[in-house]
Amino acid sequence: MHYYRYSNAKVSCWYKYLLFSYNIIFWLAGVVFLGVGLWAWSEKGVLSDLTKVTRMHGIDPVVLVLMVGVVMFTLGFAGCVGALRENICLLNFFCGTIVLIFFLELAVAVLAFLFQDWVRDRFREFFESNIKSYRDDIDLQNLIDSLQKANQCCGAYGPEDWDLNVYFNCSGASYSREKCGVPFSCCVPDPAQKVVNTQCGYDVRIQLKSKWDESIFTKGCIQALESWLPRNIYIVAGVFIAISLLQIFGIFLARTLISDIEAVKAGHHF
């Protein structure tokens, strides 16, 4: 039996530092997401009383920001250290996680296309759940307001969905000043007004439905998003393809570097 030493095998500095630079962006983005999330929780007093996390209603957008931050920070750290230290274990972790995320994204996209009714029902439940908690969380409130203003919509299927919120409910048991109203983000903007009128939605739903469209958006946000997607399908597809290509590029760099390291290690065993 003869053993040969591959004396020409070496780790490419080009791939090594390109992968390091690639992951620095991941790591820094993770730091930013974590910083923003922790700052937002600090502003709401969650950090000083962690039991508030379990008492939150609806979906707290900050949780999503923190989750993305943790994943990006962890991947960036593993990729940076793995590339600099030529650590196959960390590089395999980075590569494997990116591959997993890539296929999860692909699966979600395919399932969302095949089961559109199910997705629509889940989004309705999500929106209605957060309508109920509209006044409980400032971040959630800003998210819904931004969604309604950007899409010129109101509620999940229409303004009447705001009956789900205790403050906007039209029942006789409610003594809220916002009773039978909608949030200001449902209001049709007046170009003549330079200052946002946050009370423009008060008592709107007391009027006849035929007059609602004079002052508020009557289209539901689910319908608005369903109309928005076909009009912007090329933008959505472009973003998805760009993210996928970045992930594939990262996988390629990691696998190439792993192969170089393994070749060098194999060359030392003779």
Curated annotation (Swiss-Prot):
PROSITE patterns: TM4_1. It is found in: Cell membrane. Glycans are attached at N169. GO terms for biological process: positive regulation of Notch signaling pathway; protein localization to plasma membrane; protein maturation. The chain crosses the membrane at residues 18-38, 62-82, 93-113, 233-253. Pfam families: Tetraspanin. One of its GO terms (molecular function) is enzyme binding. The keyword Isomerase does not apply. Its main location: membrane. Residues 39-61, 114-232 are extracellular. Disulfide bonds join C153-C221, C154-C186, C170-C180, C187-C200. The keyword Transport does not apply. Keywords: Cell membrane, Disulfide bond, Glycoprotein, Membrane, Transmembrane, Transmembrane helix. Residues 1-17, 83-92, 254-270 are cytoplasmic. InterPro entries: Tetraspanin/Peripherin, Tetraspanin_animals, Tetraspanin_CS, Tetraspanin_EC2_sf. It comes from the Eukaryota. GO terms for cellular component: cell surface; endoplasmic reticulum lumen; plasma membrane; specific granule membrane; tertiary granule membrane; tetraspanin-enriched microdomain. Residues 114-232 are annotated as: Necessary and sufficient for interaction with ADAM10. It is a multi-pass membrane protein. Interacts with ADAM10; the interaction promotes ADAM10 maturation and cell surface expression. Part of TspanC8 subgroup, composed of 6 members that interact with the transmembrane metalloprotease ADAM10. This interaction is required for ADAM10 exit from the endoplasmic reticulum and for enzymatic maturation and trafficking to the cell surface as well as substrate specificity. Different TspanC8/ADAM10 complexes have distinct substrates. Negatively regulates ADAM10-mediated cleavage of GP6. Promotes ADAM10-mediated cleavage of CDH5. Belongs to the tetraspanin (TM4SF) family. PANTHER family: TETRASPANIN (PTHR19282), TETRASPANIN-14 (PTHR19282:SF261). This is Tetraspanin-14. It comes from Homo sapiens. The lineage of its organism: Eukaryota, Metazoa, Chordata, Craniata, Vertebrata.
